[in-house]
Amino acid sequence: MASTPTLNLSITTPFVRTKIPAKISLPACSWLDRSSSRHVELNHKFCRKLELKVAMCRASLDVQQVRDEVYSNAQPHELVDKKIEERVKYVKNLLSTMDDGRINWSAYDTAWISLIKDFEGRDCPQFPSTLERIAENQLPDGSWGDKDFDCSYDRIINTLACVVALTTWNVHPEINQKGIRYLKENMRKLEETPTVLMTCAFEVVFPALLKKARNLGIHDLPYDMPIVKEICKIGDEKLARIPKKMMEKETTSLMYAAEGVENLDWERLLKLRTPENGSFLSSPAATVVAFMHTKDEDCLRYIKYLLNKFNGGAPNVYPVDLWSRLWATDRLQRLGISRYFESEIKDLLSYVHSYWTDIGVYCTRDSKYADIDDTSMGFRLLRVQGYNMDANVFKYFQKDDKFVCLGGQMNGSATATYNLYRAAQYQFPGEQILEDARKFSQQFLQESIDTNNLLDKWVISPHIPEEMRFGMEMTWYSCLPRIEASYYLQHYGATEDVWLGKTFFRMEEISNENYRELAILDFSKCQAQHQTEWIHMQEWYESNNVKEFGISRKDLLFAYFLAAASIFETERAKERILWARSKIICKMVKSFLEKETGSLEHKIAFLTGSGDKGNGPVNNAMATLHQLLGEFDGYISIQLENAWAAWLTKLEQGEANDGELLATTINICGGRVNQDTLSHNEYKALSDLTNKICHNLAQIQNDKGDEIKDSKRSERDKEVEQDMQALAKLVFEESDLERSIKQTFLAVVRTYYYGAYIAAEKIDVHMFKVLFKPVG
């Protein structure tokens, strides 16, 4: 056997920004065919630009040329590491100083606070800073609202509130007239703006402000415009459907916009305010009206807190402490950079869990109210973190065969339903409520996709449709970490995302350009490492004559891709390479065992090196295995030999325990296990369940394209689903075993699930995106 080039796995390669190599050996692939020098058409619908990049790849093997191409485009890794370090430091500070959450101010809510009269009876506002804040922030066209996203609903509701405030106190007349002119000229745009962009409770608070404006004698506004009358009519009908006694008895979603509801008994409503901060559903405007009617000290304390924190202004909703912590964690995880912030994320989720209730959570702590969006996100993240989460929390949102988003409101939100769908996938055995939630959310989202109705009423993001289509195609079982990151880098809106409350607003801890920049740097650095490792994998393939076992380069690429998409960190190169090579060696050993007729003892002798190895494929297979084991010293080498010996023994008995072998070798290589761990009852349970699932998934993968009875396929799919739920329970629940050990089993099983259920043409696309396509 030819000598194999040595790859020093303890050293990570410099960061490189590569072009697609002109010559890279990826034969037997639908988009790279080694048998022909002609460019092959893609099986998947790439965009034209991507097709041209792929077409640059040719099938001839020229490892040195690839290496030259990689390093000719290299960016000094010291510079990249410095950029990563700077952004990590920034994000760590952002997360550790989150407090009640970061959100921009709202002209609408600030205007409502300005209406509070002087406590000593003078004809002036109690908080004059609010009027100055309003005057200083008028936009050039005379409106107030989000300066980067011109939406009629947002601009008009903010501007109308500010005009009412300035007119009430007869200040800044020029600014006020400019605002009135804007309203007069732009109110008609409400007819043209899609209703999905309507701010929350617009049909309730808009008529209330119009009434105030009319009472103040602002005669220049188009009160009788048809669209204005229509909106007022819709608001009246909505209020007529909700009995005021219900609002006074329990917290409903309408409490968030209570400033738009007349003739409420505010003394009775006081019992519904949040005890800790004195607000009504964390809404400054609603709390202002409550204070005006009751002079409640807790409401006043909340208002003063906001003015102090937001420099004389107020946001649309506050606090947003739970919301910020949950969504920040989600973004960092999906972007593939959460490992930099493990301690911070642990603290964030511990904080959320401390405020968890039997009905879930709202955007802020200590609320008597809950919504399905925050509850779904919190349930999923906390369950994965190891907290004991009761799935029955979702019964609070179940109404017949549907799930509602907010109390008293039917859920029509794509993003909230999508988060419910994501949470429902983390089902443990026997959790029927999550099965119901999954079916409902899956049907809702599929219908939305089919009708191209994926615009959302809580957030404006250009990438929501693509994100949800991808999420429907790739469940979390099959969505390997680096595949998820490669796509979410496309879907993450960063500062492009705009959130919808009663006005538009932005949240720095959720939508942050630094997250994206860090994710691009990290992905590119890891990808450069993976490309170098792939070069060495090809050298290893050639040197060990792997081809003679019927194993193609496409098989080699797929094996390495699965490892790199699951264990992607640069510092885990040894585990990644061991995973990929072990998978190939399993195929090599199985190949010659199918032909070898010797006894079990004879075959074991091959493994231990004590027998006559003979010539040809048998010699190559065993020599390759011995070479792999020889790269490790001492106790690790002995553990690996024992693992392979156990695998070979089971193989001879007709049990293909590849999943257990891969998980155990990875755990051994990572230094996470010893003999006591390997003999632990839970470790054995994980091994047995992993073997069962991987066996069934391998059969499903082998049956792709075959004529299999639907009943048989459905039965096997159902068994896999039940076993995956059991595995999730073993992995996520707290136990004596380290989480990292259990996570390895899950990582291996997910690659089998991916291979079984993802179409070949999709796999080709994923391999290209993860290993070869530059990001950013």
Swiss-Prot record:
Chief place of localization: plastid
Binding site for substrate: 238, 457
Domain notes: The Asp-Xaa-Asp-Asp (DXDD) motif is important for the catalytic activity, presumably through binding to Mg(2+).
One example GO MF annotation: peregrinol diphosphate synthase activity
GO-annotated cellular components: chloroplast
The entry's keywords: Chloroplast, Lyase, Magnesium, Metal-binding, Plastid, Transit peptide
Protein name per the record: Peregrinol diphosphate synthase CPS1, chloroplastic
Signal peptide start-end: none
Keyword presence, Acetylation: no
Binding-site list for Mg(2+): 371, 373
Transit peptide keyword on record: yes
Role description: Involved in the biosynthesis of labdane-type diterpenoid including marrubiin and other labdane-related furanoid diterpenoids with potential applications as anti-diabetics, analgesics or vasorelaxants. Terpene synthase that produces peregrinol diphosphate from geranylgeranyl diphosphate (GGPP).
Pathway: Secondary metabolite biosynthesis; terpenoid biosynthesis
Catalytic activity: peregrinol diphosphate = (2E,6E,10E)-geranylgeranyl diphosphate + H2O
The encoding gene: CPS1
Localisation per UniProt entry: Plastid, Chloroplast
